[in-house]
């Protein structure tokens, strides 16, 4: 029999197995597709097979007559019901300073489809099979139009316009850094390195596809949406304010388990709108689940930019200035998330180096492709790729060892806090130490011997290094708060409601560890709840590497407020002054004595009015919010050694050495 887990062994800093895993392994998780409601109908979306086309007509007559069909809806029905368009980004500017074109994006396209997969009609039927069959009967007359797929093609002279209102296909232009200082740095440089590079487009493809179930209660006029989303409160707000135009109290979003997201499930998509709208139209719940093929053309894509990086160096190899131009493919629509990867996290282009002057220009361009958004780092990997690759090229041109060139330009720990040449101010970090640890781990000193041995066997061997740094808890310029509500029940058990969602990172375990550590409560008496817009008034959700830094800090503040309330109740029970009460390991004691009561004793009293201090209302619940005063900067060093077969070109990764400075670890097993 395994040893029972105690609060002490479940404390902050302990390696603890994920408490959610037994539930998930046994199949007891509740994902979007697990939601099935009485009288539920099923929806299938008819989508454009063309990248760009005029929609001449939509004939739904045959589909409406098909077996089991509840109804067929088009963009005309959407307009008749006066639903608002999906949110866009109205904060961006074009090159001349004029506002970016706020692309209209109804949940069902009207008049024109602008990418493969653009939704055109919605078929609702009694069963999924009937909905699929009926969808094939919807006859759409398309007139194909010239289209743009490649990023570089979007801004070439004569390129077809995706939007008439943006004839040059430029959605926005954004700049950061000191352009004049960069120009001076390049003017005085002994050497300039230029690198043109492409970061290819990717699809997220999480294990769980997107899905949504919509309900409408005709008695209350209230919508309820079940969907796997990173930020239920944010989605509730956007749908209520901009699409359905109802009070927030009339739209309830519930998120259960989320089977992976990588940023993709934090967007606002047409399908949640469609199932809620259809539920009201037909007076019954409506369910939609994406299949894998559908997801590839409708889930937000990531990356996709064509960029140029220029690095100016003096005669000793010191970095003088860095200039980066990014052409970012945002796809067919300007969404609230389109610009993020090319703007929020470009500060990482400075890397861990002392480059005094940096300038970045990001040009977002339209194309006839699926909209893009944050994906796995949301611009951080692209930023690291830019600086680390241009350093490698400069080292090759100058015939300087690439590690030595990095070392000459690393920010020393004595320079902290360090204001980089681009946006960020690092509060701490010992970057040389991290790199040296990685070099030792990779046995860099023995590399040349291994390379020579590989040559004798007809193999090429190479060693690459990168020193990444990222922002956590951001975005940097708009740090959002998170909320936590903590209730100690009358039996001493604890219920935690958090504004952060869980997408497989182990949040349930980490948050429970914080509560157990702070309150001294055994983990089996802690329940963590998330993903319900009714349970908390606000919530940040999960994204930007902020679940623990922001959400965990909100939980910590809630425990502090619980302890303070408990001190006052304990003082009443122990007939002592509140300032004489201390809390440790789940017990309140009078300073200098052995007199005390447990948290469970205090909780029991908290619900009995006569046992409370004068003026205190019964109950033992506290809510706390946390807005980070600054972001954090996890950093590290990675070294990869590979071997290439000269005859076949086959590449084999031989070793990959990683050192990460992530700060304080709540659970090393989760890091």
Predicted regions: what they are:
Residues 158-244, 412-493:
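Helix-loop-helix junctions that connect adjacent transmembrane helices in secondary transporters/permeases
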Residues 45-80, 121-142, 211-282, 336-348, ...:
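Alpha-helical support elements that line or immediately flank enzyme active sites
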Residues 452, 578, 591-634:
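Internal maturation/activation junctions in enzymes
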Residues 89-130, 263-315, 372-397, 418-443, ...:
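Glycine-rich and small/hydrophobic secondary-structure elements
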Residues 20-23, 89, 95-103, 169-212, ...:
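Glycine-rich loop/linker segments at domain edges
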